[in-house]
């Protein structure tokens, strides 16, 4: 009873809190917060509800009871039922379904004597059976949950007891908010708790979150600032602080609050300090934390909402037709009621036909008709298929089973199959019309290879590295005898290169099987326990093709000039080193430290490498270098005090600096490089780790300096280090820096150590890590430089963002400003070249801050960090105040190769009639190049580019493009405008006109505005493919939502990262790709695959099968019920519409419930109208599902008409056969039931395209079960069901030849029209499905010839249509050559304007010129004929 009260109290509080949780009392007063100061006792105004956590110890006993005593304990209960409430609650839930309520109404109605049609108990049978089956299923499910809950609640953990003053064993269910918990390695965390102590020297705790979000890579959590420096374990009795944090919520990536000490000093808390329930402690000996959320208020439980429920398009169509069946039922019942009233009115005075009531009262015909209406409702209730929905669920489970059992979906490398997370929308896979795809990790492998870089305005091609990649690829191809016909490399798809670089690619970097990308195995542990295991997904970034980087010879020469002498005093004068040298040093330092890479030992990948501090190292000549770095920084800084050449006095006390706040120090979100191709929202990304390989050891000895690079005493060499990165981009940059002996040696929460060639080990004090977010699109690290002792900000991000944050340089300014402007212009040119080669680009920049500037920023940043409400906004504002007036150092180009089979899959999906949109965070040139490489765009496509700076210009440019497209197809009668029909594309599929649209993120923002949405959708409907570049996660979801809601089409979104989650959830079907980017996309998806190529078979084969199977099965159910119910309806015309049945009630009930239920289920699971091989070879067949050809509205009515015809035959053939005989009512009904059974079963045989022995076995079993039941029932039931008496009827009929003749004749006549129609359809006017079905019966040679003929006819139709389209044009323009895959952007056109004048046209539109004037300014190209 206590548990029930607590459960009710919990839900009541949740209900009350839900109404007030989001109520804000007003905007956050940031200026008042600034005035509070660091140790001010003034509490900022907090909006909404917050939680105060007081430690569960003796000194806080009264306060604990006041605050924490009201919170729920850690007991969980996921069950819905108890022994007392199971029956009423389960029935209550089941009667939420309209169908169950309908049949319950019929049961109640049958208990009314005036309208009773059946024996009362019989009417209840179907409903009772359905309710019982579902109740048993729910009960078993709930009992399983109960056992799991009991097991979890009784787990043991160490909890501090305030009475015994020590840690004691307690069950999880007894843990409360405020308890101190001590956990050891490999223990599961029992509740959400703030980390106060870790045995790790750096205050780090490693956790595995696979039980929470599916990710198996380890994550790091940080001890609360101020407790990490303690040498001993935290003593709960000495803990005198309290915690104030936000109310419980389900956001795994957010935790806001602060810890307030007894002296009112506050320390900000973030998700980096929170250990979540369900995670496991790894590689940490022991941790101590205080519980802040327990039980059902933990984030894990709040996220445990189960799979999302989606209703498929086919199910919505079936629900509509059920309503039509209800209308048909009402019409039939009204007919029976009117007929009964008319019949009684004719015999009103003849008591033989109109039997009076027991009191002698005669019921009027009108009232009798009213009663008969309800009697007919009961009699004809089978018209509404109660078993339809149960059968649909069974069929869907069978379909899902076969999808997951398909061996073609198995990924040997990842040991994964396709996951079907949504069980009720498999049929929607066969009706997809629009596909929205992410790029990185979805279309590409997300395995990054460092290819090129630009430093200080000089481009370094790394030609030797390119040759190495080629040789590596060729070696793999030779070993595997694998000939790749499609290029997997994006860099070789581009023709233009920098002037100083020569083309080194003689052939494509072909794709290779993914299981050869992992490299060799490595050894975990040592000694006897060591075992050799293959690389898993956590260590995927381990192939030599990814880890090895061959240095560029020109850059290598410049590195060799970097020596300590360059910075040492010479003849009492300081020689300024070349500015390019300083750029190179900072560039590679930024590559090495501007990340969150964790350095590990290869034999123990999870153990970090730590080095002694810089102060204890015998490093020579560094003191002399400091002054020069300071002077260089002075020249570059924009601070007035630094411009004067004076070193500012530190305004930050040592104690203040030592307590630097952690801004997501150890595990920020996926770094900025993710934005380069996709803007990432979530901080959780998959791990990529790798160790040095033999190839790198060979290149590692290349002399960057005149002397040898020495490692620290007792520390491993650079090639013995293992890097664990959150994304492959980070690891690629760190390995690139290591190739130039700028080696990341170690990383702790307080410092980063880099071994920089001749300069020796450099230890940077790590002040802050500002993680990546989708708004800033960059990440930064704030460090104190060991040489200059200045605060330096290193930033990396997308060029579109970094270029806007650079310090403004005037052409008339100082020489340094001019040089920076030149560097910026050259770097931008290099970035464009990289993007045209399909490389992912990043900009690297830095900023030097004075201590005064840093102290001011730090003060404001601390206040933002310790706020609870609006923390994200305040931290964003703080980061943007820091990341400005940057100095550009250079840029990088990283190659991300296409996945195996992507071009073929996209080509097949295009042929299937699916319009594909690529939504990416990449820049325009990169996105277009990759679109050509994966065959999303074809070389002869007409390419239109939307890249404007204003809304008006966007609208005018779209209008111009639409006019150009309309000119091309003005003679085509099939053209349809958007206002007429949004569902059909304006351009016929075989018109020969192929167009592609490229739109940037800024322009997309304009296009998504309500005033331009219709115009934008009309433009995209003309295009076969659309590429949205520089798109944010929010824009991705808005695009999907716009297309889905306005065009009323079936959409599918596929992605692999956290930035794709919103898009995946908005689409009709969301598919997650399990790869390098974690499991967020998979957890949010309806289906999960391991590679994009699996999508083609999932849609073209299984999607087609699921849709056609379920469509035909649903239609068959409607047909079967209408055909059988009409037998009862026709009989009413011969019994005075009295509501009498000519068959026994038991047979009537079991006809649908037992005799004819199994065959359609087997049909729905096993039917194959076309083989998988043919469906893959002929993707065009998929269009039948897009058009819903298997289940159209007229198909439903034709099916019902056929059912009416068959019921007429089934009734009147036996009627005329036995007319004039002395056959009684039940003897007449027996041949009707038997013939009806044969008709409905053989009807299914006619409709089946692939009969197997299972089909035949089930059909024969259904027939035998009917005869067996009829014989046994007729022999045993004499008067068990009055007034019917089926005694010995079947036995008599089975001895009568007329019975067999009637059954055969009735079945033949009833099925003859459908059989003749199917025969004529297959021979005279076969559909594409039937023509393709013929291929399955051909020999391999005949099949090959037939496929060539099919494809040849299709190409001939396209060519004919294309030439007709060209001849129909009035402009007579000469066709422009389509952009090639070699140089995608060269001949891309917009509004038929040459690429060279495109930007001028857009600029004119942006400046407000009219459309005509803009194109006049664009040059003479407007008049060219294309």
Swiss-Prot record:
One of its GO terms (biological process) is phospholipid translocation. Residues 512-524 have a biased composition (Polar residues). InterPro entries: ATPase_P-typ_cyto_dom_N (IPR023299), ATPase_P-typ_P_site (IPR018303), ATPase_P-typ_TM_dom_sf (IPR023298), ATPase_P-typ_transduc_dom_A_sf (IPR008250), HAD-like_sf (IPR036412), HAD_sf (IPR023214), P-type_ATPase_IV (IPR006539), P-type_ATPase_N (IPR032631). Residues 119-121, 343-365, 1135-1145, 1217-1224, 1274-1292 are exoplasmic loop. Mg(2+) binds at residues 438, 440, 1056, 1060. It is a multi-pass membrane protein. Its cofactor is Mg(2+). It is found in: Cell membrane; Endoplasmic reticulum membrane. Expressed in placenta and, to a lesser extent, in kidney. ATP binds at residues 438-440, 730, 772, 796, 840, 920-922, 996-1003, 1030, 1036, 1059-1060, 1364-1371. Residues 506-531 are annotated as: Disordered. NCBIfam families: ATPase-Plipid (TIGR01652), ATPase_P-type (TIGR01494). Component of a P4-ATPase flippase complex which consists of a catalytic alpha subunit ATP10A and an accessory beta subunit TMEM30A. Belongs to the cation transport ATPase (P-type) (TC 3.A.3) family. Type IV subfamily. This is Phospholipid-transporting ATPase VD. The gene is ATP10D.
